[in-house]
């Protein structure tokens, strides 16, 4: 059981108000929360909570600025990500980087990118509900440590897990939702844009809305 000193209690009361994520109170989760990024990443890299650990090459923990005000969340690693240990490095990742650059964002400077699941599902299938649930604790901890102001869900799976289970991404992408003190938005997954290039203008409109919102509430992202 995690024991807090008085200083930590004050900090955790603040987090309870701001970080009550994924349909769970912070106090219910506190015994599983990490205080340091290094310990979180170390344990995640050794995770064997579901069967995806048996087929992975690398755990794909995430990439970017650990103090980012904007957090992007995808569904899970693909083949290239599994081989390189970094999210969104294949063709979809290259497209994502171009879209980020268009609104002055950079995965290595002013945002963080993570996934719902940290290990590649075989044949790039959607992660199963039980796999998502086994892995979501790592993401909760990342969110609690990063403390972003905006979360952007890349694709249907992430949006349904993070924003709401009945999310209709084709109709509700680009709309901001407030959840537990955080602004959240979903946009189309880069892989979906590669399959259907006609949707690229819609996704770019989402990014322009994101840029406007960053300018409104994120004082450090562009500075």
Regions found by a protein language model. Give the residues of each.
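A polyanion-binding, active-site-adjacent surface
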Residues: 2-6, 22-223
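Charged/polar low-complexity intrinsically disordered segments
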Residues: 9, 14-19
